[in-house]
A protein has these predicted regions:
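Extracellular/oxidizing-compartment recognition motifs
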Residues: 1-381, 393, 409-410, 429-433, ...
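Active-site acid/base region of carbohydrate-active enzymes
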Residues: 103-127, 321, 329-366, 372, ...
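C-terminal capping/lid segments that line or modulate ligand- or cofactor-binding pockets
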Residues: 134-147, 386, 404, 447, ...
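Non-catalytic C-terminal accessory modules of carbohydrate-active enzymes
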Residues: 125-152, 221-222, 279-280, 548, ...
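Alpha-helical support elements that line or immediately flank enzyme active sites
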Residues: 255-274, 314, 322-327, 391-421, ...
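Active/binding-pocket-proximal capping segment
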Residues: 34, 43-45, 418-419, 470-473, ...
Length: 758
């Protein structure tokens, strides 16, 4: 089958076992994806998304589902073909199951397996009308014809005698190994062009039942909440057209599960959307559905008339609303059940924040929902439209993960993938995995900051050290573009920094034609962080060279781009544009003395003529706020998030209205800020070996929360006493010490509980 052809395949292997095994470990992978079953029960899905030269496999113990006698190991494998998601790499359609030891070798893929190409499936392309012309890079829809589907194919009682024997197309190889035992037609002399296999390094994705909250609207039929609760079937008469709008009550990711009986000749179409839109395509309040329609990606199911037929989408969909369009033929249709199987990376909400300002709790819930559904096998910018792991988004998402869940595995995955994405010149791709290469050089600088984030929060210098060659390559690449002025000259590729309204394509003045103060300062910011990484692993000379380069950029940018009359940095020396972004980076990169930074920050907040930071770049603005000692103004900067709640949003959007995406986890960063700035918990030294707690309560009278730490949990409870006093209860994990700061006073902290009064 050509590598760019859509196809769905079922594979089966029957095993006779003399007794139930204690252990039966296999390694399994596929291209593009698979679901694995043992005796009808799902035991694995994957593979973890990556690229062909780092192709992942899962390791699974099948023993719990095996028994004495006949057993069936079965898999569904699919290839999206030429309309694959942009994040999906592929070599060609394939499936591999390899025993861990000789005793399980009978399960190995080979001639003992039987295969069936399922003609029931077709892909449903997403059209411009479906997504209002927006950029779309995720999976297409699916159409499934129940009359052609091999019902029960995964069960032991299914007869597969008409299926064909599986041909061996290739031999797998681990990363670093070549095909020394090549399949027929392969050379076997250093050939590493196929799948280079690596073990999965993240846990299985969460999969759990999720039901709709309500039926919002019907036409052509009456429908109560009974059938979406699983308690009663919905009967649709013959020759009927009906439509039902269902609401999950929040944006979610889920595989659609539809169970039908009867209804031969019927068609059921599920359309998924984050919001209902009016006749002009406007979203409005996300709770409103009156006189609004739902457009988006859709799946189509054609029942064959059998009883209790269970359709499930191969891949998950994202959205809040699902519109169910039904057209029956000559026989009635029973919808026995319709629900979702929620899926996401299995983050656990260990961190928490509570205060005497109730709406902050609602914001926390909204942001955490967005962070959850923005994380699968990679971080994703938007689970609905793209499902791509961008560096700019991922840095913020990873900090949320560290502070709310304490789980760093998806962050490590991202750091590794971005390093894998580097081009020979040195910089990373903007996003990865991505079959379509995109280059945003400023994101390579954000990557340096992300590795520094990991270094400050995890005591793992060996891990960090392996990424220093890549960081050096990035900074060397940038060094080639610093011209005689000491600033960056004209820069290639897409120099996106922020979705600022007055920046074309998000690119600041001077980026393309030379002397961008914005990107020159971002480079200084990255060099400072790289210097810390180098110094902490003992590379002092390299660290000093980075500090020297950063100092040179700071001096050149201040000399050429500082406006002494307005006391602001221009976006470039030859530009009349002034932005929050450039001046925030001036603070974060120390482009002016510490004593002058607070006044600059106050001007940034007060001057309404500046190009404003977006939801994404407001993270950097809020970090600058904390840096200059204005953290007490943090909560007042969250007015846009309160506005999101008023719009009925259940996850933070990509940008202010009109927005394409209603779920963009880069805008969920205030959950990090509530813990790191308002509660005040930050690393005081690399590896989070010590902690600094410097709360900035602003208008709050009380706040309490928890931050997961590698050694345990950090618990903080704060209550104001009068105008300037504070009572604090702090509990640190064993082996962790630090300092607590309040109103100019600093006191030591030790492991365990301590009660402080200021």
């Amino acid at each position: 089958m050509p590598a760019d052809s859509f196809g769905v395949f079922h594979a089966r292997r029957t095993l006779d076992l003399p007794a139930k095994p204690d252990r039966f470990t296999v390694h399994v992978s596929a291209d593009n994806r698979y679901r694995l079953y043992v005796n009808g029960t799902q035991v694995s899905s994957g593979p973890q998304r990556s690229d062909v030269t780092h192709w992942r496999y899962e390791t699974v113990d099948l023993a719990p589902q095996l028994h004495a006698g006949a057993n069936v190991i079965a898999a569904v494998v699919w290839n999206w073909g030429r309309r694959h998601p942009v994040a999906q790499h592929s070599n060609r359609t394939g499936f591999l199951l390899q025993a861990d030891s000789p005793r399980e070798a009978a399960a190995n893929t080979g001639t003992g397996w039987r295969l069936y190409r399922d003609s029931a499936y077709a892909d449903l392309p997403v059209t411009n009308r479906d997504i209002s012309g927006a950029y779309y890079a995720a999976a297409q829809g699916e159409a499934v014809d129940g009359a052609r589907y091999p019902w029960g194919w995964e069960r032991t009682d299914f007869v597969d005698r008409d299926w064909f024997t599986v041909p061996v197309a290739d031999a797998g190889a681990n990363v670093g190994q070549v095909h020394l035992h090549a399949a027929p037609g392969r050379g076997g002399y250093g050939d590493a062009s196929g799948w280079q296999l690596e073990p999965r390094d993240i846990p299985p994705m969460e999969e759990s039942l999720v039901r709709f909250a309500s039926v919002r609207r019907t036409s052509g039929i009456a429908a109560s909440d009974g059938f979406i609760k699983g308690g009663a079937a919905l009967v649709v008469p013959a020759n009927t057209r009906a439509s039902i709008l269902l609401d999950y009550a929040k944006t979610t990711n889920a595989y659609a599960v539809l169970e039908t009986s009867g209804g031969a000749g019927s068609t059921i179409t599920l359309t998924y959307a984050e919001a209902a839109v009016d006749s002009a395509g406007r979203k409005g309040n996300r709770n409103d559905v009156d006189r609004r329609t739902v457009r988006g990606i859709h799946d189509r199911f054609l029942p064959d008339g059998g009883e209790r037929r269970r359709f499930q989408t191969l891949y998950w969909r994202s959205g809040r609303y699902v519109n169910v369009d039904i057209e029956t033929g000559a026989t009635p249709l029973r919808i026995e059940d319709l629900h979702g199987i929620f899926t996401a990376y299995p983050f656990v909400e260990r961190g928490r924040f509570a205060s005497d300002l109730p709406w902050l709790a609602d914001m926390w819930k909204m942001n955490w929902n967005g962070a959850r559904i923005g994380a699968f096998e990679t971080y994703m910018d938007t689970p609905y439209y793209e499902q791509l792991q961008y560096i700019g988004d991922t840095r913020l998402q990873a900090l949320i993960s560290l502070y709310v869940s304490g789980d760093d595995r998806l962050m490590r995955q991202a750091i590794t993938h971005f390093d894998d994405s580097r081009i020979p010149e040195g910089i990373t791709a903007s996003r990865y995995p991505s079959e379509l290469r995109q280059l945003i050089p400023p994101f390579s600088l954000v990557y340096v900051a992300m590795v520094h984030d990991y270094h400050m929060h995890r005591d793992d210098s060996r891990y960090v050290r392996q990424y220093l060659p890549g960081i050096r390559g990035i900074l060397d690449w940038y060094g080639r573009y610093v011209d005689s002025t000491g600033m960056l000259g004209p820069m290639p590729y897409w120099n996106f920094v922020d979705w600022a309204d007055r920046w074309q394509r998000g690119v600041p003045a001077g980026a393309d034609n030379g002397h961008s103060a914005t990107i020159s300062l971002l480079l200084a910011y990255a060099l400072d962080r790289a210097a810390v990484l180098e110094a902490d692993v003992g590379e002092r000379a390299m660290a000093q060279s980075y500090r020297t380069r950063a100092d040179s950029l700071r001096v050149a940018t201040r000399t050429r781009a500082w406006d002494p009359a307005r006391k602001l940095f221009r976006d470039s020396p030859d530009s009349a544009a002034y932005s929050q972004q450039t001046n925030v980076l001036a603070i974060l990169s120390n482009a002016l003395p510490q004593a002058e930074q607070r006044a600059l920050m106050e001007r940034v907040l007060a001057d309404s003529t500046l190009i404003p930071a977006s939801y994404y770049f407001s993270f950097y603005l809020l970090e600058a706020l904390e840096k200059v000692g204005l953290g007490d103004r943090y909560i007042e900067q969250l007015a846009p998030w309160r506005g999101m709640l008023a719009l009925g949003l259940t996850s933070a959007p990509e940008k202010p209205e009109p927005t394409r995406s209603d779920s963009h986890a880069w805008a969920a960063h205030p959950n990090y800020g509530l813990l790191a700035t308002v509660l005040g918990v930050r690393p005081a030294s690399r590896g989070f070996r010590t902690v600094r707690i410097a709360p900035k309560l602003g208008p709050l009278r009380s706040a309490e929360g928890r931050v997961p730490h590698p050694r345990g949990d950090i618990d903080v409870a704060l209550t104001r006493d009068g105008a300037n006093g504070l009572s604090a209860r702090v509990t640190l994990p064993a082996g962790v010490a630090g300092r607590f700061e309040w109103n100019g006073r600093s006191v030591p902290l030790h492991a365990g509980r301590q009660d402080l009064h200021f």
